């Protein structure tokens, strides 16, 4: 019995020594391992028995404690966890992934929702606007010119895509008309009221179909085109004659094509009435939009080039003739000052004249303007009586009373001898002389 007790004591002492060493090692592992980071975040102690069961024996913590009751005395406190190499590994992986992504194109984050898209577009426009404001005048023109040329190339590509796939290989062999027939059909076409309008789409399947439907009952037809130039109208006339097989009689007023269907006209099948060579309605509209945009861009590019040349020329003149420019500006400023002073003086004179005119407009002047009816009646009553008597004399003289008898002759002879000039009688003198002449006639 004594031997057994001694052996047990030796074994327990050896086991306690081993457990102390293991506890120190386990304490270091627990402080450095990420397994117990959650435990380290909580301010509490960790018993060594739980660690021994979990790490050494790899058993569950729900094991009955009677098997390891002798380990309860040895315990340690947890310490803050140290940073391990896992974070460094994750960082290195992220950096390597970023390097790999930099080689390839960075994918833009997908925007979720309409508001996010609108917000991104607003920011993009604001950024472009600020960049444009920071540019110089020459850089602005160059930027506009670059954009215009890119737009021209893009429109040319879209125009090529909108061209019909099948090539137009149909040939036109029109009938020969005599001058009399041509005159007759042209007169008929000018009088007829049936017409086909051609809008901004130009020639497409619907226009040709409409023409054939008109030719079903009428020989002549008017094609009215108001959205193209006269040269383009002539090209459209040639194209319509080729596609429909009709005869172009005349282009009236530069916008109306008069066409004749032909002598032996028969309504063709639907494949010819709406040929695939031409564009459908939607594509014709897209082509017209591209054509208008291309025309506008081609007008805009030379204007920008001209502005750029003027700007460069102004910059060169500023470098060469800096003093001359300053003198010119000074002279212009002086001229402007003189013009402003003259205008101010003219305004002052006009104001003075207006004030003087207002002072002259007295009550008596206004009374002359606003005369009453009673005053006019008084003036009529105050008319002299001899004027009424003279009005009774005949007005027609038949050029006989120009001499006014002997008195007039004597008077005129005396004046001729004195001054050798023709007499100038007043109306009253003429009336008196005429009255005297008539009285003499009555006495005779």
Curated annotation (Swiss-Prot):
Query: Which Pfam families does the annotation name?
Result: CRS1_YhbY
Q: Where is the transit peptide?
A: 1-72
- Per the record, where are the segments of Polar residues compositional bias? 92-101
Compositionally biased tracts (Acidic residues):
346-357
Give the coiled coil ranges: 292-355
Sorted keywords for this record are: Chloroplast, Coiled coil, Plastid, RNA-binding, Transit peptide
Gene Ontology cellular component? chloroplast
According to the entry, what is the taxonomic lineage of the organism?
Eukaryota, Viridiplantae, Streptophyta, Embryophyta, Tracheophyta
Question: Where can this protein be found?
Answer: Plastid, Chloroplast
Name the record gives this protein: Uncharacterized CRM domain-containing protein At3g25440, chloroplastic
> Cell membrane: is it a keyword of this entry?
no
Q: Which residue stretches does the UniProt record annotate as biased composition, category Basic and acidic residues? A: 406-426
Entry's InterPro entries?
A: At3g25440-like, RNA-binding_CRM, YhbY-like_sf
Source organism per entry reads Arabidopsis thaliana (Mouse-ear cress)
Region annotated Disordered sits at: 77-107, 344-364, 392-426
Ranges where the CRM domain occurs: 175-272
Q: Which GO terms describe its molecular function?
A: RNA binding
